[in-house]
């Protein structure tokens, strides 16, 4: 399983939110480039970057910082937040980003997703951020009537490379991932699912590895690697692609 460290950018700084609340942003570092280098040095095979300002404003805001991050490390960078036009996605790819993550646009403008998947095959993912099973949009400030599972099925037919699923109630809480919701989502689609939100320990990652067989191929880790609850290098060795020990598949009895 791919263990993917997250960098959330707000005002050019590396922050973490609590349940998506911008008023509860905690600054962990004012040099996101150095943070990116640290995670790459510890064995990360991919970096997840969110432009929080962009998600709120509907356009890329931290493009300069993102460009510096992409130039500073040799691993693929995926970016989400405020990507609602072909031009905004093209800008990211022009500065070295490997994968773009669409969120609000997937709900409001699914034709854009289709167009981008055709233009950039294999490089478009959709982030489904759910609150009580319903898709949240516009930087999690609004909750739609769309079910997360329905959106995932629709996006899978439109050619997206992966679904990044975030349970907002778990995000930043260190309460563990929502295994039941992940299991349900992964079972409905054939494309990879990347889990996000609530991962707080190596045990949480092991529980997610047990879902690899049904398509959960990665886990985004945020607050826990900044607080030290998870040592990224150890996590990559324990559950990453080169791990020495297999984990038994989840038969549905794991507690979410």
Curated annotation (Swiss-Prot):
Gene Ontology cellular-component annotations: cytoplasm
Family matches, as InterPro entries: Aldolase_TIM (IPR013785), His_biosynth (IPR006062), HisA_bact_arch (IPR006063), Isoase_HisA-like (IPR044524), Isoase_HisA-like_bact (IPR023016), RibuloseP-bd_barrel (IPR011060)
UniProt keyword DNA damage present: no
Keywords, ordered alphabetically: Amino-acid biosynthesis, Cytoplasm, Histidine biosynthesis, Isomerase
Pfam families in the cross-refs: His_biosynth
Pathway in which this enzyme or protein is active: Amino-acid biosynthesis; L-histidine biosynthesis; L-histidine from 5-phospho-alpha-D-ribose 1-diphosphate: step 4/9
Cell compartments where the protein resides: Cytoplasm
Gene Ontology molecular function, alphabetical: 1-(5-phosphoribosyl)-5-[(5-phosphoribosylamino)methylideneamino]imidazole-4-carboxamide isomerase activity
Active-site residues, record numbering mapped to chain: 8 (proton acceptor), 129 (proton donor)
The protein's Enzyme Commission number: 5.3.1.16
Chief place of localization: cytoplasm
Reaction(s) catalysed (UniProt annotation): 1-(5-phospho-beta-D-ribosyl)-5-[(5-phospho-beta-D-ribosylamino)methylideneamino]imidazole-4-carboxamide = 5-[(5-phospho-1-deoxy-D-ribulos-1-ylimino)methylamino]-1-(5-phospho-beta-D-ribosyl)imidazole-4-carboxamide
Enzyme superclass (EC): isomerase
Any GO BP: L-histidine biosynthetic process
HAMAP family documented for this protein: HisA
Family affiliation: Belongs to the HisA/HisF family.
Protein name in the entry: 1-(5-phosphoribosyl)-5-[(5-phosphoribosylamino)methylideneamino] imidazole-4-carboxamide isomerase
Native source organism of the sequence: Picosynechococcus sp. (strain ATCC 27264 / PCC 7002 / PR-6) (Agmenellum quadruplicatum)
Gene name of the record: hisA
